[in-house]
From Swiss-Prot:
Assigned keywords, A-Z: Cell cycle, Cell division, Cytoplasm, Protein phosphatase inhibitor
Pfam family, one: DARPP-32
Name of the protein this chain belongs to: Protein phosphatase 1 regulatory subunit 1C
Region (Disordered): 25-108
A single MF term (Gene Ontology): protein phosphatase inhibitor activity
Single biological process term from Gene Ontology: cell division
Biased composition (Polar residues): 55-73
Chief location of this protein within or outside the cell: cytoplasm
Compositional bias per record (Basic and acidic residues), positions renumbered to this chain: 45-54, 99-108
Compartments, record wording: Cytoplasm
Length: 108
């Protein structure tokens, strides 16, 4: 290797080993639809179904913002968290474990 050339890093990569048995992988492969079978299934759909799809999308586009489903994350209120903590002893058992471990370390 030349002194000015960038160094190449070589990693020892283990051979890929499948996590599932070959028989299971074969079963999964057989169940998966092929692109050709998907085309055949789509050709058999009746035109009524396609018309229903169009009207549903038009209805959702014409709906007012209040009528559309709003998905907004609302975090739990502190009142609810305190209630859970009182019920179960702790809403966050992981925090209690780490706190007791810290106390043990300080005592020793």
């Amino acid at each position: 290797m030349e002194p000015n050339s960038p160094k190449k890093i070589q990693f020892a990569v283990p051979l890929f080993q499948s996590q599932i048995a070959p028989e299971a992988a074969e079963q999964i492969r057989k169940r998966r639809p092929t692109p050709a079978s998907l085309v055949i299934l789509n050709e058999h759909n009746s035109p009524e179904i396609d018309e229903k799809r169009v009207t549903n999308t038009q209805e959702s586009q014409n709906a007012s913002p209040k009528q559309r489903k709003q998905s907004v994350y609302t975090p739990p209120a502190m009142k609810g968290v305190k209630h859970l903590k009182d019920q179960n002893g702790s809403a966050f058992p992981e925090e209690e474990e780490s706190a007791s471990e810290r106390e043990e370390k300080w005592n020793h």
